[in-house]
Design a protein with these regions (language model features):
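Conserved amphipathic alpha-helical segments that form helical-bundle/coiled-coil interaction surfaces
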Residues: 100-178, 192-194, 208-219
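Short helix-capping and inter-helix turn/linker motifs at the boundaries of alpha-helical repeat units
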Residues: 185-189
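Short linear motifs at protein or domain termini
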Residues: 1-106, 113
Length: 229
């Protein structure tokens, strides 16, 4: 006998798989907007309420991002949740900050060099724009955390490496912790090193980008070490 309740529960899952197939078949990229609800429901031959349930499921898996009043977009790092390594549940935040910094030293200078090598004009424009936005927020003593995260994410995407964007949560998880730990005392250093990183990537100078990112992280380490003594 058919289990109608089970089929009903599985429907959003089945539709979500169809949406993923649609994204892949249409070659939609991270940040691209999906068709509107009416168009997509017609395309997939499903009801709009079922489509909404499937979209909520995909949003919970960080495959799409739903922006109220704007639409639904392919997530920046599809399928990568915000805290895949469970940093939230690590109680020793001082140790966490130090260890995240070590990992960032291993990853980010090389990522910046790759971005300088492979970033296209759109990537460069995004990185420069975000650099400016972070700078303006810092100058006006406003919270720059989210734009800082977007800046480092844009650099990772500029590498054109399929794996690196999936490492972004490691970087993103550390930035709010670093901002909290340093207390924004590194305003000048952040502005200067962000500019150097962005300009090096715009110039496609891999060595300069790598050195600038290393210096950026070095300032953070020095400040964090002095505050944790």
């Amino acid at each position: 006998m058919m289990n109608l309740e089970s089929d009903e529960k599985n429907l959003p899952q089945k539709i979500s798989e169809d949406i993923i197939s649609f994204i892949l078949n249409e070659h939609l990229q991270p940040g691209d907007k999906l068709p509107n609800e009416a168009h997509l429901a017609k395309e997939l031959n499903i009801g709009r309420s079922s489509l909404r349930e499937a979209m909520k499921l995909l949003a919970s898996r960080n495959i799409v991002t739903i922006r109220q009043g704007s639409g639904t977009y392919v997530a920046t790092s599809p399928g990568v949740i915000d805290d895949p390594l469970g940093f939230t549940f690590i109680s020793d935040k001082n140790k966490l900050v130090q260890d995240l910094l070590e990992v960032r030293f291993l990853l980010e200078p090389a990522i910046a060099a790759m971005s300088a090598t492979y970033a296209d004009n759109n990537d460069v424009h995004k990185i420069i724009s975000l650099c400016y936005e972070v700078e303006e927020l810092l100058k006006h003593k406003k919270d720059h955390t989210q734009k800082d995260i977007e800046f480092h994410t844009a650099i990772a995407l500029g590498s054109k490496n399929l794996i690196i964007p999936r490492l972004v949560p490691i970087i993103n998880s550390s930035i709010p912790l670093f901002v909290e730990t340093t207390g924004n005392v590194l305003k000048t250093e952040t502005i200067e090193t962000h500019r150097e990183i962005a300009n090096a990537i715009a110039e496609h100078n891999a060595i300069k980008a790598q050195d600038a990112m290393s210096m950026h992280l070095m300032y953070n380490r020095r400040c964090i070490n002095s505050r944790q003594k």
